[in-house]
Amino acid sequence: MAPPNKSSNRNKSNNNNNKNKVKSKKSKRSIDETPEALDLDQAAISKSIVYKRGDCNKGIKKLVKEFRQVMEPYTATKLQETSDNTTKDFVNIAAHYGVSHLVGFSSTDIGSYMAMARLPKGPTTTFKIQEYSFQRDVAKAKIRPTSFEKSYLNSPLVVLNGFTRGTPHLEMVQNMVQSLFPSINVYTLKLSTCKRVVLFNYNKETDNVEFRHYAIKVSNVGVNRSIKRIIQSKIPDISNLGDISDYVMNGLGATESDYEDANDGQVELSSKMINSKAKNIKLERKGLDINTTQKRAIKLEEIGPRMNLSLLKVEDDLYKGEVLYHQYIKKSDIEKEEAKLRRDEAKIEKERRRKDQEANVDKKIKEKERKRKYLDQGNEDKHSDDDDEEWYRKEVGENPDETFKNNRKSRSTGGGRPNKKFKSKK
C-alpha cells in the first residue's frame, strides 16, 4: 500500500484554512451590515405590539398584519393572538419584552377602531377608522409595482403635518405618534438606512387624520430617461433599430409615468451617504471615489396601507381613567367633578378589597401551616410507637402483647385519661 502524499495533505489543509478565512471575513461583514449595528441605544428604542381585540372581520385582521409591517422591525411580527386574549394579557407580557406601546384594532357592528396606548400608565388615544385600503389596492393603481422587502429592515421616519399648537387633544395625538416610533439622531443617522416614511396629516376641513406609508427612492439627476432604463434594468430589445442613438435621441425607452426631475426634490449627496457599507467597499475596490457629491432626486412611492382616522376619545390611563377628550360627549365642570369622585371612590373600594383578599390569603396560609405541623407531629408519634415495638422484639424476643400496646397508648394519650368530658352525675 502506497504511503500518503504529505504534500497533497498539506495543500488540502492550506485550502481549508483559506476557506475558513474567507468565511470568517464574510461573517464579519454580515454582522456589520445588520440593522442592530446602528448608532442607537437599543434600550431606549420604542417597541410595540399590534394586535386585534376580540372578534374582528377579515378586513381588520388583514389590516393588523399590514400595520405590523409598518412598525417593523421593532414589533412582534409573528404574533398569533386569539379572540380569547385580552388587553391585560398583552400588558403582562409587555414588561418582560420591553414593549413601550400597544396598538389594538377592533371592529363592531357600528364601525372599526384603532387604539394607541403608552405603557405602563397611558395615555390612550382611540380613533375610528373611517376608510382604509390595503397594500394590494395601492399596488393595483401603479403601472409598475415594485417590491419593498429590504425596506422593512429599518424603522420608518415619521412626518407630522397640520398638527397646530393650542389644541390639547391634538397635541396629545402628536406626542403619542412621535413616541410610537424610534427616535433618530440627525448627527449619527445613516442616510442609507432611511428607506421608509410614515405620514400623519391632519385635515382641518374633515377633522380627520390621514395615514400614509411611503418608500424613499433616490435617482440620478440630469440623465436621459432612456439611459436610466438601461442603467437601472435589463438592456431593452433594440434589434429593430439601426443604432443605439435612435433609442436614446428619440426617447423610445421613456414613458409618461417616469419620474420628472423637479428642482424642489433635488439634493447633493455622495455615494458614501446613500449606499450601504458593503456597496461602498465594492466601489472603492473598483477605484471609484465615493466622497464626490452629485445631484440626486428624491422620490416617494406609496406602499400602503392607507387609513383615514377620526379621533374619538383620549384617556389619561391605559384604556381607562379620566376622559380628557370625546368627540361626541361634552361634560360640564360639575359633571367632570362628579365623575372624578366616582373614580376615586372606586379606587378606594378596589384597594380595600385588595387588602381584604391579602389578609384572607395570609390567614389561609397560616391555617395550612398549622395543620401541616399537626400532621407532622402525628407522624412522629406513629414512628415512635413503631420504634417501641421494635425495641420490645429485640429485648424480649417476642412480639409485643396487648398489655404492652395498651400501656403505650395510655402514655401517648396522657395517662389513659378520656378524650371526651362527661357530665358528672348529681
Curated annotation (Swiss-Prot):
Organism superkingdom: Eukaryota
GO molecular function list: rRNA binding
Domain spans labelled Brix: 46-320
Ranges for region Disordered: 1-34, 339-426
Comp. bias intervals (Low complexity): 1-19
GO cellular component: preribosome, large subunit precursor
Residue runs in coiled coils: 329-373
Record keywords, A-Z: Coiled coil
InterPro entries named in the record: Brix, PPAN-like
Pfam family, any one: Brix
GO biological process, one term: maturation of LSU-rRNA from tricistronic rRNA transcript (SSU-rRNA, 5.8S rRNA, LSU-rRNA)
Composition-biased stretches (Basic and acidic residues): 339-368, 379-405
Family, similarity comment: Belongs to the PPAN family.
Name this protein carries in UniProt: Peter Pan-like protein
Organism: Dictyostelium discoideum
